[in-house]
């Protein structure tokens, strides 16, 4: 009898610990997690306290899985309205993966779906008791936010974020999304945070917090012209987390490619 009571107390404390732990969402994933994905998750939930993070693992290491883990954590923490901005070609893939791997229902919104079901969509977005995970293209993201400007978005995920790196001197879609999502916690995903120049990093980090590097002029003076790469690396640590394939070779198998000539 006493033994059963101790087991019940242990089970109660264990459940209470898991309920209060940020790691309980790791148990909800319908997948086998790799160590680097858990490390990325830990880095992300810490960074969300100060605005967000860029997860920049190399291709094939599961950034979408990492994003799903973080999304689960954010929802467990009380978030209700989540916007996922991504290339239009990836919307369906994300919808399927969120459902199959995390049991999360999402909706793809574009101009057509909004115009033809405006009342129902508006009702769902305005209902703060209901979770809404919205998948939409880069181009439509800003239009959606403007259309429902009274909606408070709790979290923003940007996939293939390098496409928006030229936020201050590129396409309007990057600048529009930057202006409209200021202050919203963000998760940026990209395998190539640095494509053409160091200023790519300035643009991406500015999405998280423009105060980190200041203006592009200041960034150029310190890092492009000054060449202080060690200081740049240190300042990136809290906002950029990257895993390379060579770091995970012990527990992940990659297919070998043969060049035929």
Feature map (PLM): residue ranges:
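Conserved helicase ATPase motor motifs in RecA-like P-loop NTPase domains
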Residues: 184-197
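Walker A/P-loop NTP-binding motif
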Residues: 45-46, 64-78
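Walker A/P-loop
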Residues: 50-70
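Conserved RecA-like helicase motor-core motifs
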Residues: 104-114, 212-216
């Amino acid at each position: 009898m006493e033994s059963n009571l101790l087991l019940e107390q242990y089970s109660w404390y264990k459940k209470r610990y898991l309920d209060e732990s940020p790691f309980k969402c790791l148990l909800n994933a319908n997948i086998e997690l790799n160590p680097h994905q858990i490390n990325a998750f830990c880095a992300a939930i810490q960074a969300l306290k100060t605005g967000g993070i860029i997860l920049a693992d190399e291709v094939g290491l599961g950034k979408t899985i990492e994003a799903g883990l973080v999304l689960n954590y954010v929802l467990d923490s009380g978030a209700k309205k989540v916007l996922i901005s991504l290339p239009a070609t990836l919307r369906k893939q994300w919808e399927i993966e969120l459902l199959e791997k995390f049991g999360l229902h999402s909706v793809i919104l574009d101009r057509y779906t909004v115009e033809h079901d405006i009342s129902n969509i508006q009702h769902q977005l305005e209902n703060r008791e209901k979770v809404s995970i919205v998948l939409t293209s880069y181009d439509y993201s800003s239009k959606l936010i403007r259309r429902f400007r009274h909606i408070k978005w709790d979290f923003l995920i940007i996939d293939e974020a390098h496409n928006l790196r030229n936020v201050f001197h590129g396409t309007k879609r990057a600048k529009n999304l930057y202006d409209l999502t200021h202050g919203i916690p963000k998760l940026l995903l990209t395998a190539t945070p640095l494509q053409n120049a160091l200023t790519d990093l300035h643009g991406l980090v500015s999405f998280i917090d423009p105060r980190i590097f200041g203006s592009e002029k200041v960034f150029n003076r310190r890092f492009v012209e000054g060449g202080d790469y060690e200081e740049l690396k240190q300042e990136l640590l809290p906002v950029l987390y990257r895993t390379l394939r060579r770091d995970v070779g012990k527990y992940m198998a990659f297919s070998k490619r043969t060049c035929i000539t």
